[in-house]
């Protein structure tokens, strides 16, 4: 059952024109406030990055806006549908990539994706046809009939993403989709996500990799201590600086490094010898 709340003033109402509109989202676990009145608008057709330090509230926010966790306060709206008043309609519009530990490892890749489609109410034949297309797109055809437990980390992330896309959602929500993924698999995933956005879809990712967010995303929100401290286009949030440097300024994450007396690299306090320079055109052997 959705939490009972007092009516919001007009200025705090979510924006139904947005792909995702969050107002005053709040969640507490015991004495710890995980999400503290968080508000955010994610435009339709954007590639939106959520960044923040560990424990900032990103994953808790994602879990609430996708209908898997009941908030203690606030509201989340998906393309005009209130997540907790119309949860089934909201979930139909969302593709949430499961974490590797949340899938059935003894199913083959093909079985897993077909199963995900059938859970969404698709006939088996349609789910199988779509699964074949997705597996080919993710370059997993040779592994389609291998159990997922025997997949590499990159292959597992790709098959998890395929299960999120099987029902052709309007919004993809991905928590750390590139974590532990090799460069080849990462490039494959990026290409598919960018193509999806070009068709009008919306992608929301959480990530710790600032360079990836700066390169891929159109928009970014910096989350710290359960609140959004900056949001907008990547250029607006970066404000003329490197995004990682701006992030550190916003969350107060840079601290002076303590000198470790015994960690001297073997130079006994002497400057390191200069690295010999190779003359232009000469190949060092």
Please describe what each predicted stretch is.
Residues 114, 118, 125-143:
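Conserved ABC ATPase "signature" region
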Residues 172-176:
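Catalytic Walker B motif of ABC-type/P-loop ATPase nucleotide-binding domains
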Residues 187-199:
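Helical segment within the ABC ATPase nucleotide-binding domain
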Residues 213-215:
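A short, surface-exposed alpha-helical micro-motif characterized by mixed small hydrophobic
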Residues 231-232:
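ABC ATPase "signature
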């Amino acid at each position: 059952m959705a939490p009972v709340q007092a009516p919001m003033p007009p200025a705090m109402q979510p924006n139904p024109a947005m792909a995702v509109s969050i107002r005053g989202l709040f969640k507490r676990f015991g004495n710890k406030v995980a999400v503290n009145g968080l508000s955010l608008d994610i435009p339709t057709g954007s590639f939106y990055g959520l960044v923040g330090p560990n424990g900032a509230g990103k994953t808790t926010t994602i879990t609430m806006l996708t209908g898997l966790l009941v908030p203690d306060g606030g509201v989340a709206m998906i393309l005009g549908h209130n997540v907790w008043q119309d949860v089934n309609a909201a979930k139909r519009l969302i593709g949430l990539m499961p974490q590797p530990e949340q899938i059935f490892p003894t199913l083959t890749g093909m079985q897993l994706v077909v199963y995900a489609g059938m859970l969404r109410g698709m006939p088996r034949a349609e789910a199988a046809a779509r699964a074949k297309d997705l597996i080919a797109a993710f370059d997993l055809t040779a592994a389609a009939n291998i159990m997922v437990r025997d997949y590499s980390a990159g292959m597992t992330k790709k098959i998890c993403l395929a299960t999120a896309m099987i029902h052709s959602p309007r919004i993809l929500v991905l928590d750390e989709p590139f974590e532990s993924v090799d460069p080849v698999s990462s490039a494959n995933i990026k290409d598919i996500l960018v193509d999806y956005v070009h068709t009008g879809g919306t992608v929301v990712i959480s990530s710790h990799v600032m360079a990836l967010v700066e390169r891929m995303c159109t928009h970014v929100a910096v989350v710290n201590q359960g609140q959004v401290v900056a949001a907008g286009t990547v250029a607006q949030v970066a404000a003329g600086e490197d995004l990682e440097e701006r992030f550190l300024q916003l969350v107060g994450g840079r601290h002076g490094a303590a000198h470790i007396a015994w960690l001297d690299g073997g130079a006994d306090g002497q400057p390191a010898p200069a690295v010999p320079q190779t003359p232009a055109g000469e190949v060092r052997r």
